Amino acid sequence: MGKRFARMLRDKEQPTAYGADQRQRNEPNKFQVAYLGSLEPGHAHATAHKLAKRIDVIENNEPGAIDLTENDLVFITNGGCVENSSMGSQDKPAAYNTELKPGGGWDMWRKIAAQDPVFGHPDKFCHDPEQTNWMSATVETLDQKIIPYIKNICKRDPFTGHVVTGGIVTVKDSSWLMSWTINRQPQFRDQPKDHCLVWVYSLFTDKPGDYVKKPMRACTGKEICMEWLYHIGVPENQIEDLASNSANTVPVMMPYIDAFFMPRAYGDRPKVVPDGTVNFAFLGQFAETPRDTIFTTEYSM
C-alpha cells in the first residue's frame, strides 16, 4: 500500500487535477477546504459548505487520485502522539527527532487548520517537544540473575502466568522519574518461557540519572537497564555485568507522546464532525468528543 495524502480544493473552480501546479506536486499532502455554495436549494446538504473533493494518492512512487462526492466519507486522524518516535538498541541511544516533516499527521493538520479555525489549533499541542517527550524501554531478561530483585519488590514470581506487578511501580526518588511494570508473562507467543519482559519508562529525559550520570535520551539500552537495576536494588558491583549479559534493552524516544496533555481550550481540537462539513470527520486523541478517554485507552488508529 502506498501512502495516501488528502487534499481539499478551496473552491469548485480550482483545477482538480493532481499536480495542478508545481507546488502542489511537491506537497501532495496539501489539504484544502472547498467552500461550495453550488448545491441546489432543498438539497439535504444545501446549507453545508465544507466538502472533501479529492484524495491524492502516491503508490509505488506514482501519483494518482480518488475523486470524492458528498456521498463519500473521509476520516482524518489529525496529529499523532507517536509521530517521530525512534528506536535505539542495547548499544545505541534512540534518536531525539523533533522536526515535523511534510507528510505526517501534524503537517496535514496544520494545513487543514490554516484554512478555518473550526479545524482546531494543532500548534497548541506540538509546539514544544521538550514539554511533551518521554522515553520507554523494553528490558528482556536473558537468564535468572535479575529475577530475584523483581520478586523482592512485587512479591510474585513472574513465571507463574499470573499478574506480576499488578500495575505501575514508580521510583519516587528517581531523577528521571522512572517507572516500570511487568504484565502477565509470556507477553508474546514466541517468547522464551524463561525470559521476562519489563516495560520501563521515564518522564524526565533531560535529567542526569542517579547511577548513570547522563540524561536518559543520551543513554543506550544497556545504560537505561543499568539505571533500572540500580533502582531495584542490584548491588553496584553487579550492575554493569547484569545489564550487559543478563538483559537486552531496547529504548524508544517519543517526542510528542504527551501532546494531548498540553494546556488547551475548547476549540483547540476540532469536533469529530466540524460545523458545516459534509463528508469528512476527525478521529483520535485530537478530536473533541464528550467524555473521551486518553492515553492507552483511546480509539485512534
Where are these regions (language model features)?
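Rossmann-like flavin
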Residues: M1-Q14, Q22
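Acidic carboxylate-rich catalytic motifs and surrounding loops in phosphoryl-/glycosyl-chemistry enzymes
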Residues: D11, A34-L39, L242-S246
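Short His-Asn-centered micro-motif
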Residues: D11-K12, Q32, I76-N78
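Acidic, proline/serine/threonine- and glycine-rich low-complexity intrinsically disordered segments
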Residues: T16-A20, N26-P28, V33
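A conserved short coil-to-beta-strand element within the FAD-binding core of flavoproteins
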Residues: F31-N61
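Core beta-strand elements of the Rossmann-like FAD/NAD(P) dinucleotide-binding domain
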Residues: N61-L73
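C-terminal segments that line or cap access tunnels to active or ligand-binding sites in enzymes
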Residues: N71-N78, V82-S300
